[in-house]
């Protein structure tokens, strides 16, 4: 689906075609209640400010993590037909994208996994007793009961 130098593709923002959203955000008592304070106050600080590049501008958490913070970790991959068509028509990122192959995924939709993470003194801890199945074996075992 992609070609060329990975670092150059990321620097150009090519990944935003597949993940035009942030990777996660702060959590309060509810999943999104911290957003009402304004992302600039919650997800950023005086040292770290938002970036205005498409895709990267959707990052909602850039501040230094501290013990006691609870954040979401939400990697995802989407194939948004209108966005694919727009980028292809404009010839965007053609040095990094293989549009003919991407076209075959337009009916896929997308998927996003989410974990809620507690930041501790020594690292982090995934909250909750069970993760969603993510490997092929885990998904098949879940489907087959």
What do these predicted regions represent?
Residues 1-41, 64, 69:
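Active-site cores enriched in adjacent His and Asp/Glu residues with nearby glycine-rich loops
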Residues 29-145:
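Charged, cofactor-coupling segments
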């Amino acid at each position: 689906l992609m070609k060329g130098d990975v670092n150059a593709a990321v620097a150009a923002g090519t990944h935003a075609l597949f993940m035009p959203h942030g990777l996660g955000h702060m959590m309060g008592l509810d999943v999104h209640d911290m957003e009402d304070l304004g992302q600039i106050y919650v997800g950023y600080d005086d040292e770290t400010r938002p970036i205005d590049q498409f895709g990267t501008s959707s990052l909602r958490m850039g501040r230094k993590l501290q013990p006691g913070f609870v954040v979401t970790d939400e990697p995802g991959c989407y194939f948004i037909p209108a966005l694919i068509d727009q980028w292809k028509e404009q010839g965007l990122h053609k040095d990094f994208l293989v549009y003919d192959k991407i076209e075959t995924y337009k009916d896929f939709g997308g998927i996003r996994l989410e974990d809620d993470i507690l930041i501790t003194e020594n690292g982090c801890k995934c909250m909750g007793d069970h993760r969603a199945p993510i490997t092929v074996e885990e998904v098949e075992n879940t489907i087959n009961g």
